[in-house]
Amino acid sequence: MEKNIQTSRQIWRFQAGEPVRIDDPIAREQPVTLKINGEEFATLVCTPTYLQEMAIGFLVSEGLIQAYEEVKTIWIDDRQGFIHIELVRPIDRLHQHLQTKRYMGSCCGMSRQGFVFASDAKTAKKVQTRDVKLNAGDCFRLMAELQENARTFQQTGGVHNAALATKDGLLLMREDVGRHNALDKLYGHCLQNGLSLHGKLVVFSGRLSAEIILKVAKIGCELVLSKSAPTDRALQIAEELDITTVGFIRNRSMNVYTVPERIELKS
């Protein structure tokens, strides 16, 4: 298991009507501050694993950089809780103006305000392909595979899981206390390793909010599967960006919300 992902604490568990003293596994949560070109830029609250991937995915998805090649150096100071990033160029004026040491909680991502609206317009583009085709059985199988491999969630109940997949199965999986962070870790891994995202989809454990759909669009995937529900704004954005959303994948049942052409609905 990746180190630092969970801890434990003694608790009282009420079981079969009786209190029992046990050691209970708890998901770890830690603030990590991104320092870009020597200046504090943002603090992310996250599971302290795959931090370089998370930082790279965050920078690209938020429009600070366009590619991993724009990162000159990146290193982690575990003791102080910093990710030091030196870029090949200064941050543009829009991001400099909004560089106010933003604090991003694990549950809801960052404060959106004007910064992200401009960033989203720049980085969340309409999907241009419809190459991913699934049937209901594929959706059930991929979600089952995600849940079977969600070992930290099984032990703690305290993390979200996200995976990059094809029709045939999961390719890469990441977990984090923050839904957005799990996706940034996936994206950062692909960027660092030059992995093609063509024909890939996202399998996700959490709620499909507007911000999650925007993350999926920025990654470049045309379809997202989730065991949870969407919001109305998320579905509006998914339709605008031609992203297929499938939610409530549970007990051999699922809902196809947007762009159903990628899902074979007939049995």
Swiss-Prot record:
Required for formate dehydrogenase (FDH) activity. Acts as a sulfur carrier protein that transfers sulfur from IscS to the molybdenum cofactor prior to its insertion into FDH. NCBIfam families: fdhD_narQ (TIGR00129). PANTHER family: FORMATE DEHYDROGENASE, SULFUR CARRIER PROTEIN FDHD. One of its GO terms (molecular function) is sulfur carrier activity. Keywords: Cytoplasm, Molybdenum cofactor biosynthesis. The keyword Transcription does not apply. SUPFAM superfamilies: Cytidine deaminase-like. The keyword Ribosomal protein does not apply. The active site is at C108 (cysteine persulfide intermediate). This is Sulfur carrier protein FdhD. GO terms for cellular component: cytoplasm. Gene3D superfamilies: 3.10.20.10, Cytidine Deaminase, domain 2. One of its GO terms (biological process) is Mo-molybdopterin cofactor biosynthetic process. It comes from Shouchella clausii (strain KSM-K16) (Alkalihalobacillus clausii). It comes from the Bacteria. It is found in: Cytoplasm. Belongs to the FdhD family.
